[in-house]
Regions:
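His/Asp/Glu-rich acidic catalytic environments and adjacent acidic regulatory segments
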Residues: 1, 7-119, 123, 127-130, ...
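A metal-dependent hydrolase signature that marks the N-terminal structural subdomain at the beginning
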Residues: 107-108, 113-187
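Auxiliary, metal-adjacent structural segments of Zn-dependent hydrolase domains
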Residues: 161-219, 232-233
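Flexible, glycine/threonine-enriched loop-and-boundary segments that flank and lead into catalytic domains
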Residues: 197-225, 344, 348-369
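Short pre-active-site segment immediately N-terminal to the catalytic Zn-binding motif
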Residues: 220, 224-239
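An active-site-proximal "capping" alpha-helix that borders the catalytic cofactor pocket
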Residues: 243, 267-280, 379
């Protein structure tokens, strides 16, 4: 009927109108915003883009790091009010949608999509807060190892282990993976071997092939993995990570009807990260000291970037929604203040903060994804906890993991599925376990570095 057609059309318009803040931000950040070239210690210029920024922050050349950092934030800072306004628009949209559907808050609505109790979110933040002294300790160690008196935000990404060569040809990587995943038992390894032997993996870069790596497939197909192999240790991690997704999909599809064979976004990264944790454990036991150091450095960075950083993001995201929900003015100045406060809390007094970092929120696209980022930290914690159980308990933990988690798809709420597999995300325990793994790695790293 004409009426249903016009109602469908108005729905489309409504969706388009409501996604304006995100679209404006995306266009601005990816297309319109330009940065001055970064300059290195020899005065040589380097083109600064969203893609090269982190690469320059990882550089040995402190002048280049500082220049990239200053130029990026000066560009964003020049539009601080505009970007505050687009993010406030996004927050208002989330609150409007929540109230229109009779939810008390934007967070309640966002989490209810996956039936995630709000205590999971609060529990993540509260538990990570308890372990912030560990992050401060890591940051202090970074300062000592870099040998600088004034640790700045642009010194946070540069690797602490230099000049260690670690080539990883694909055939060797397959061996490492199979050995690392041995604790998972025959049923799991058979799936991985089937994937390797039946060409699930498109390994090397090719003309017209998309960059990065990902797993895909449909209910009746095998999972497929696309890689762009370049013989690095991170390629090995990517292989193990993507096989985690593929095995999860394989077990889900084989054991669930098509309507419940796809798993929820809340648990999407758990299987892949659990595999990475098993790989780290195995490699840690089988590498010489130099390579172990390289690995531990990368591991500690992964913890910092995933568990700590994403929790800080989650805390900021919730804070700006609370400000708006309380009827207080949500301005860019207020956002800068709240962000600076959190950055200080997370990094402690070891880092000399500056005005730029208070505007970091304005370069993070995930704040336009409506309570999405916390799942990186919860998923990471769940994976660390599960891998810990697999390595310490053995068979019973493996059976729980495969039968209660990998084979379950979305046949139950994600929180319940994880609970049955041995991880209760409404309690502090999984996050505590993850933080304790971080602590062990930090101790091992410090001991090797000072030895």
């Amino acid at each position: 009927s004409t009426q249903s057609r016009s109602s469908a059309a108005s729905d489309v318009y409504k969706r388009q109108a409501l996604s304006t803040p995100e679209n404006v931000y995306g266009m601005f950040s990816n297309a319109d915003l330009e940065f001055k070239d970064a300059v290195d210690k020899d005065g040589k210029k380097h083109p600064l883009t969203q893609g090269t920024f982190i690469k320059y922050l990882e550089s040995d050349d402190r002048k280049l790091r500082q220049s990239a950092y200053n130029n990026l934030y000066e560009a964003y800072g020049a539009y601080n009010n505009t970007l505050g306004s687009t993010l406030a628009g996004e927050v208002k949209k989330n609150i409007f949608n929540a109230r229109a559907h009779n939810y008390k808050t934007a967070r309640e609505r966002a989490l209810s999509n996956n039936h995630i109790p709000e205590e999971v979110y609060d529990n993540l933040v509260a538990t990570v807060h308890k372990y912030l002294p560990l992050l401060h300790k890591y940051t202090q160690l970074r300062k000592e190892l870099l040998g600088i008196d004034d640790l700045k935000m642009y010194d946070i990404y540069t690797p602490l282990v230099k000049d260690v060569k670690f080539e990883m040809p694909y055939d060797e990587a397959k061996e490492w993976m199979l050995k690392a995943l041995e604790p998972m038992g025959k049923e799991y390894l058979d799936v991985v071997k089937e994937g390797l032997n039946h060409r699930w993996v498109d390994v090397y870069e090719n003309k017209g092939k998309r960059s990065g790596a990902y797993s895909s497939g449909a209910h009746l197909t095998n999972p497929f993995i696309l890689l762009n192999w370049s013989d690095t240790i991170s390629d090995l991690y990517t292989l193990v990570h993507e096989f985690g997704h593929s095995a999860h999909s394989y077990f889900s599809r084989k054991n669930q009807p098509s309507n419940s064979s796809d798993y929820s976004i809340f648990v999407a990264e758990v299987a892949s990260t659990c595999n990475e944790a098993l790989l780290s454990d195995y490699m840690d036991k089988h590498l010489d000291d130099d390579r172990r150091l390289l690995l531990l450095n990368q591991e500690l960075e992964r913890f910092r970037a995933t568990l700590f950083r994403q929790t800080m993001f989650a805390e900021f995201e919730h804070k700006i929604h609370q400000i708006e929900e309380a009827g207080e003015p949500l301005t860019s100045t207020r956002m800068n203040e709240e962000y600076a406060k959190l950055n200080r809390l997370y990094f402690g007094d070891v880092v000399e903060t500056d005005d730029h970092i208070s505007k970091e929120w304005s370069r993070i696209p995930h704040f336009y994804m409506n309570y999405y980022v916390y799942q990186y930290a919860t998923g990471y914690s769940a994976a660390q906890s599960l891998s810990h159980q697999i390595l310490t308990e053995g068979q019973p933990a493996v059976e729980r993991y495969i039968n209660e988690f990998l084979k379950k798809g979305s046949s139950n709420y994600p929180i319940e599925i994880l609970k049955n597999a041995g991880v209760d995300m409404t309690t502090p325990e999984p996050i505590e376990q993850a933080c304790e793994v971080f602590e062990q790695k930090l101790k091992a790293f410090e001991k090797l570095m000072k030895h």
